[in-house]
């Protein structure tokens, strides 16, 4: 799942190594720093929680049956996982149950979410 024109980073090796010893790895940082692009280097499948066409469905599923979002080829990338914080416990449970390294990569922005902005007109 390598993006076109990806520029290799030191973090690629760090993430690859972490996935050999840990069931799940969290990658966090400010928006647009390359968390998702770096994580895609290792991911075999991905869920984009911010996908405008699927976000509402994903968030409802995270509430009803979070394990369903964890199904897929591993390592499974859960992008912007902080949108559904209940996934944290679901990932921990799945990692404990599976007992295998390299199951999940969780990316999340440390930049606060920006709410709806009003133009001030009207």
What does each model-found stretch correspond to?
Residues 1-122:
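Phosphate-binding site recognition
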């Amino acid at each position: 799942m390598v993006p076109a024109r990806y520029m290799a980073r030191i973090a690629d090796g760090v993430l690859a190594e972490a996935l050999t010893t840990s069931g799940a790895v969290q990658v966090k940082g400010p928006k647009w720093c390359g968390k998702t692009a770096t994580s895609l280097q290792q991911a075999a499948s991905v869920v984009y929680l911010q996908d405008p066409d699927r976000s509402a469905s994903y968030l409802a599923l995270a509430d009803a049956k979070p394990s369903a979002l964890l199904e897929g080829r591993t390592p499974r990338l859960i992008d912007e996982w902080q949108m559904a914080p209940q996934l944290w416990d679901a990932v921990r449970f799945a990692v404990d149950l599976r007992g295998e390294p390299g199951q999940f990569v969780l990316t999340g922005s440390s930049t606060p979410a920006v709410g709806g902005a009003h133009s001030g007109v009207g």
